[in-house]
Amino acid sequence: MLDATEWGIVALSLKVGGVAMAVTLPIAFALAWLLARVRFPGKVVVDAAIHLPLVVPPVVTGWLLLLAFGPNGPIGDWLQDWFGVTVLFRWTGAAIAAGVMALPLMVRAMRISIEAVDRRLENAARTLGAGPWRVFWTLTLPLSIPGVLAGAVLGFARSIGEFGATITFVSNVPGETQTLPLAIYSALQQPGADALVWRLSCVSVGLSLIALIASELLTRRAGRGLHVL
């Protein structure tokens, strides 16, 4: 059984992952739709930039976030001057780091789902008088929803497992930024904390497994729905 402190770590991880997913979802969908449906110069470069967090060391991503959101960074300075807000050493900063790391996976899953929608259906709707927004809301979005949700769940799984960018950007503050991966890392540094490592690791694996199964089921549902059409 987990004690109160350990349950707090789990709750913080779920909060960080949930906020990261919710904030990143509309951004990821917009980027996925842009890459799937719009032709523009430099599309390959934009696609590569979106997927950079997948290949760049997470520490580098965390450092770049620190430069951007730090007290002397352009975004951090703006947040402090206008809203009196700082994300350094805060759980909100951990959510930002998790969202950035999850973004490429979400965009990729959503883009595949949008591209799977037959353009002939969209063209047929337009010939019947439907405008671009109506085609999007009544056809493209409903058909791609299962894939979009699958990408969101996959992003959530990635968010709750984020370590490198988080510890670099917002450090490892118990009760504030110490999510499950960071708590496991801290426990590994403590002699005789093997039981704690096991408990937290089992919770982490369990949450990730549930999220991955949900993502797979949604992906299959999306495939069946499009196959029927």
Where is each model-derived feature located?
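Transmembrane-helix boundary motif in ABC transporter permease subunits
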Residues: V19-I50, W63-L65, S113-E115, R120-L121, ...
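Periplasmic/extracellular loop-to-transmembrane helix junction in inner-membrane transport proteins
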Residues: M1-A22, L34-K43, Q80-G84, S186-A195
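Hydrophobic positions within alpha-helical transmembrane segments of bacterial inner-membrane proteins
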Residues: G17, M21-F29, W33, V59, ...
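Membrane-interfacial helix termini and adjacent extracytoplasmic/periplasmic loops
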Residues: M1-A4, G62-G99, F169-V173
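Interhelical loop and adjacent transmembrane-helix boundary motif
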Residues: M1-T5, F169-L209
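Transmembrane alpha-helices
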Residues: A22, V107-M110, I114, D118, ...
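C-terminal transmembrane helix and the adjacent membrane-cytosol boundary/short C-terminal tail
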Residues: G42, R108-E122, R126-A130, D194-L229
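Non-cytoplasmic
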Residues: G70-P71, V148-S186
